[in-house]
Amino acid sequence: MTGTLVLVRHGQSDWNLKNLFTGWRDPDLTDLGVQEANAGGKALKDYGIQFDIAFTSDLSRAQKTCGIILDNLGQSGLETIRDQALNERDYGDLSGLNKDDARAKWGEEQVHIWRRSYDIPPPGGESLRDTGARVWPYYLTEILPRVLRGEKVLVAAHGNSLRSLVMVLDKLTKEQILSVNLATGVPMVYKLNADSTVASKDVLGDMSGAH
């Protein structure tokens, strides 16, 4: 067994609360989102982990979640790499729209297909497959080598960018990943083997409220 990879979806954002498609837009965390990030940090502290490096996206809601977690671990000065490769899925023309308004405009079935299909993107946006096509190469070149060297690595990112990693790590099919939702602020702790496969996975919190 080699290193440890911890994946955390950012805490609730203003636009999560308002039921808006967010994508690459950059709303702040809500008060609840801050609480969720703190809860994730406390869970990791209780777990007894100290990180060697952190990765996060180009968006402030993930960066703030990352910072809050590290504060809870007494690691506020830890090297943190920010890269848009870890950004949320780009929702294109849906970005900034209320999900109910989008259903009224395009129809419930079409919006459901855009949200939950693996490879059909919304107009001007990305599918989950498209998101994985930028996230996975970044993971392979920048993140995985550190884990295989025995480092403990934190990745604070977004629902869909993390789902694209979970799909491969958990060996899920493109049909299975469609029913997987990640709760905000709940750490997933992966210990990897030397061949980069998963040796164990611990979820430090409740995923039942995921959306």
Swiss-Prot record:
Identify the stretch annotated as signal peptide in this record.
none
Q: Cross-referenced NCBIfam families, in alphabetical order?
A: pgm_1, PRK01295.1
Q: Which family does it belong to?
A: Belongs to the phosphoglycerate mutase family. BPG-dependent PGAM subfamily.
- GO terms for MF: phosphoglycerate mutase activity
Report the protein's function.
Answer: Catalyzes the interconversion of 2-phosphoglycerate and 3-phosphoglycerate.
Reactions it catalyzes: (2R)-2-phosphoglycerate = (2R)-3-phosphoglycerate
Does the record bear Isomerase in its keywords?
yes
- What is the name of the protein in this document? 2,3-bisphosphoglycerate-dependent phosphoglycerate mutase
Catalytic residues, chain numbering: H10, E88
Question: Where does the chain bind substrate?
Answer: 9-16, 22-23, 61, 88-91, 99, 115-116, 159-160
User: Which pairs of positions does the record mark as disulfide bonds?
Assistant: none
Q: In which pathway does it act?
A: Carbohydrate degradation; glycolysis; pyruvate from D-glyceraldehyde 3-phosphate: step 3/5
Species whose genome carries this gene? Allorhizobium ampelinum (strain ATCC BAA-846 / DSM 112012 / S4) (Agrobacterium vitis (strain S4))
* PANTHER family per record: PHOSPHOGLYCERATE MUTASE (PTHR11931)
EC no. given is 5.4.2.11
Residues under site feature: Transition state stabilizer:
H158
Subunit architecture: Homodimer.
The UniProt entry, under PROSITE patterns, shows: PG_MUTASE
- GO terms (BP aspect): gluconeogenesis; glycolytic process
Annotated keywords: Gluconeogenesis, Glycolysis, Isomerase
What's the name of its gene?
gpmA
Q: Which Pfam families match?
A: His_Phos_1 (PF00300)
